[in-house]
C-alpha cells in the first residue's frame, strides 16, 4: 500500500492497532517519494537511512496512542537545519553543509515522534517565488509539470500535493508557504511572527521569516502546527504559545462572523477567473452565516516595494557570513584574500541571490539609507495600521492568495519585477507579522486557485475554524492531480 490517501488520523489508527508499523509507513513514503521524484524534482536529499533508523526506534518504543503524529513521516524544507542531514538552502554555497543540530521546529516534531524523510527543494536561500532558482534545478507543479510550483517552498508544496508525503514544513518570508500552497491546491499556513521558533532556520529576512506547515487538509495542517509551535529561549523573537490546541475551533459554525474583503485585493493585476473564484467564495461564506463586507487597505499597494527594500537589506546583512572563510563554498581559483571573498560569493550564489544582496547593500548604504530603508520602515508601519483598523471591526480578511494561477516555467525569469508582483497579496501579511492561510477555492484553466484568510496576531484557531468550514462545505481539497494516484 502507498497510504497516500489516508489522513493523519487514519494513519494513526493503523499505527496504534499495529495494522502497520512506523517502519512500513516510512518505507511506503520513501517509495512514494522516489516514484514521483523524476517528474517533480521536489527533494534535494532523501534521508532514507536516517528515516528508517528513526522509524525502527519508534516501533521499538511503541506508538504513542495519545499523540496523533507519532510515527508519521515529515518532509522538511532545505533551509531548516536537520541533524546529520544535508541542509543546503538549495545553494552551491552550502552544497556540503551537514548541521550537527536540529532546528527547534524539527526537534519539536521529532519529540512528537515524527520521522524526517528528506529535505525539499526550494528557491535558493528562499529568494524567489517560482521554485526555479534552486542550484539543484526547478521543481515542477504537481498539477501540470510545465508550470511553476510557486516558491520559495516549492518542494514542500509539490511533495504534499503529489502524495509523496502527507505533511511538510516550509518557511514564509513574503508568501513562500501560501503561494506554493495555492499553486498546488493544498493548505499552507504562515503563523503569527514568533509562533514557531526561527532557531535553525537559515536566515533570509529576520523580521519577516516564519516556519509553517503544509498539509492536504485544514485539520492536518493545524495538527502539525500544534507539534512545532513553541516559545524558545534560542529565538529572542519567539512568543509564548497562547493557544493550547490549534484544532480547538474546527467544526464550529461561523454564523455572525465578520469577514472583510479589501477592494485592493481584487483590483488591477488580478486574473478575472481568480477574482470570480474569490467572489464566489465570499458568497459561500455568506451562505454559511458570515457577514462579508468590502473594506480598504490603502497602503497595501506599497507592500512589494517596501518588502524588497527591507527583505533585501536584511538578506545582505544575513548573507555576509557566507564568504568562503567563515562559512560556505570556497573558490579554488583564488590567489589572495580578496579573490577568495569575490570568487567564492560570485560562484557560490545564484543570480537572484546576488541581485537581492546588491539591492539590500544599496538600500543600506550611506546617502541612501534614509531615502530607502528608513522610508520603507515608515511605510511598513502604515501597512500595519491599515490592518489594525480593519481588525477593530472584523474577525478576518478574505482575498486571493496570488493574482493568478501557476504560470509557465521559465516565463518570468527574465522579468524579476513581474515575478515579485506575484507576491503582491501575501507580502503585507509578513510585513505586519500576521497569520495567514491559503486553502483551495476552485480551479481556473485546470489549475488550483488559492483563497487567503488573514487574521489578527495569534488568531490561528479562528483562521482554522473558518477555513475548515469552507473546506467541509466545498470539497475542493478532495480533488487531486493525476500524479497523486491512490491507494494500491
UniProtKB/Swiss-Prot annotation:
It is an enzyme of class 6 (ligase). GO terms for biological process: translation. GO terms for cellular component: glutamyl-tRNA(Gln) amidotransferase complex. GO terms for molecular function: ATP binding; glutaminyl-tRNA synthase (glutamine-hydrolyzing) activity. Its EC number is 6.3.5.7. Pfam families: Amidase. The keyword Metal-binding does not apply. InterPro entries: Amidase, Amidase_CS, Amidase_dom, AS_sf, GatA. It catalyses: L-glutamyl-tRNA(Gln) + L-glutamine + ATP + H2O = L-glutaminyl-tRNA(Gln) + L-glutamate + ADP + phosphate + H(+). Keywords: ATP-binding, Ligase, Nucleotide-binding, Protein biosynthesis. The active site is at residues 77, 152, 176. PANTHER family: GLUTAMYL-TRNA(GLN) AMIDOTRANSFERASE SUBUNIT A, TRANSAMIDASE. Allows the formation of correctly charged Gln-tRNA(Gln) through the transamidation of misacylated Glu-tRNA(Gln) in organisms which lack glutaminyl-tRNA synthetase. The reaction takes place in the presence of glutamine and ATP through an activated gamma-phospho-Glu-tRNA(Gln). Belongs to the amidase family. GatA subfamily. Heterotrimer of A, B and C subunits. This is Glutamyl-tRNA(Gln) amidotransferase subunit A.
Amino acid at each position: 500500500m502507498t497510504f497516500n490517501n489516508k489522513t493523519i488520523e487514519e494513519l494513526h489508527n493503523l499505527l496504534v492497532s499495529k495494522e502497520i508499523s512506523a517502519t512500513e509507513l516510512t518505507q511506503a513514503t520513501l517509495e512514494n517519494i522516489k516514484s514521483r521524484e523524476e517528474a517533480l524534482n521536489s527533494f534535494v536529499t532523501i534521508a532514507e537511512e536516517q528515516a528508517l533508523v528513526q522509524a525502527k526506534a519508534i516501533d521499538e518504543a511503541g506508538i504513542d496512542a495519545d499523540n496523533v503524529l507519532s510515527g508519521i513521516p515529515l518532509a522538511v524544507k532545505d533551509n531548516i537545519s536537520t541533524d546529520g542531514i544535508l541542509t543546503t538552502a538549495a545553494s552551491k554555497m552550502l552544497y556540503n553543509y551537514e548541521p550537527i543540530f536540529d532546528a527547534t521546529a524539527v526537534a519539536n516534531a521529532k519529540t512528537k515522534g515524527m520521522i524526517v524523510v528528506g529535505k525539499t527543494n526550494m528557491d535558493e536561500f528562499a529568494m524567489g517565488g517560482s521554485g526555479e532558482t534552486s542550484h539543484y534545478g526547478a521543481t515542477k507543479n504537481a498539477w501540470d509539470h510545465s508550470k511553476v510550483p510557486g516558491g520559495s517552498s516549492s518542494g514542500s508544496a509539490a511533495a504534499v500535493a503529489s502524495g509523496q508525503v502527507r505533511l511538510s514544513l516550509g518557511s514564509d518570508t513574503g508568501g513562500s508557504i501560501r503561494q506554493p500552497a495555492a499553486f498546488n491546491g493544498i493548505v499552507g499556513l504562515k503563523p503569527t511572527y514568533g509562533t514557531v521558533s526561527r532557531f535553525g532556520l537559515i536566515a533570509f529576512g529576520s523580521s519577516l521569516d516564519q516556519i509553517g506547515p503544509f498539509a492536504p487538509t485544514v485539520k492536518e495542517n493545524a495538527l502539525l502546527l500544534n507539534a512545532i509551535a513553541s516559545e524558545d529561549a534560542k529565538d529572542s523573537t519567539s512568543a509564548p504559545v497562547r493557544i493550547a490546541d490549534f484544532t480547538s475551533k474546527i467544526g464550529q459554525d461561523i454564523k455572525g462572523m465578520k469577514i472583510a474583503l479589501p477592494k485592493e485585493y481584487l483590483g488591477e493585476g488580478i486574473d478575472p477567473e481568480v477574482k470570480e473564484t474569490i467572489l464566489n467564495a465570499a458568497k459561500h461564506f455568506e451562505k454559511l452565516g458570515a457577514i462579508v463586507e468590502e473594506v480598504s487597505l490603502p497602503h497595501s499597494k506599497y507592500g512589494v516595494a517596501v518588502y524588497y527594500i527591507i527583505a533585501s537589506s536584511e538578506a545582505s546583512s544575513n548573507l555576509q557570513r557566507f564568504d568562503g572563510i567563515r562559512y560556505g563554498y570556497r573558490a579554488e581559483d583564488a590567489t589572495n584574500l580578496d579573490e577568495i571573498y569575490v570568487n567564492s560569493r560570485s560562484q557560490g550564489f545564484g543570480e537572484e541571490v546576488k541581485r537581492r544582496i546588491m539591492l539590500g547593500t544599496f538600500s543600506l548604504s550611506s546617502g541612501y539609507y534614509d531615502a530607502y530603508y528608513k522610508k520603507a520602515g515608515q511605510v511598513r508601519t502604515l501597512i500595519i495600521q491599515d490592518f489594525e483598523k480593519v481588525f477593530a471591526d472584523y474577525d478576518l480578511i478574505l482575498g486571493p492568495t496570488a493574482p493568478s494561477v501557476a504560470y509557465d516555467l521559465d516565463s518570468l525569469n527574465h522579468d524579476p519585477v513581474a515575478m515579485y508582483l506575484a507576491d503582491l497579496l501575501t507580502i503585507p501579511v509578513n510585513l505586519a507579522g500576521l497569520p495567514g492561510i491559503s486553502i483551495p477555492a476552485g480551479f481556473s484553466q485546470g489549475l488550483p486557485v488559492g483563497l487567503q484568510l488573514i487574521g489578527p496576531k495569534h488568531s490561528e484557531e479562528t483562521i482554522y475554524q473558518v477555513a475548515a468550514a469552507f473546506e467541509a462545505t466545498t470539497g475542493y481539497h478532495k480533488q487531486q492531480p493525476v500524479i497523486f494516484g491512490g491507494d494500491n
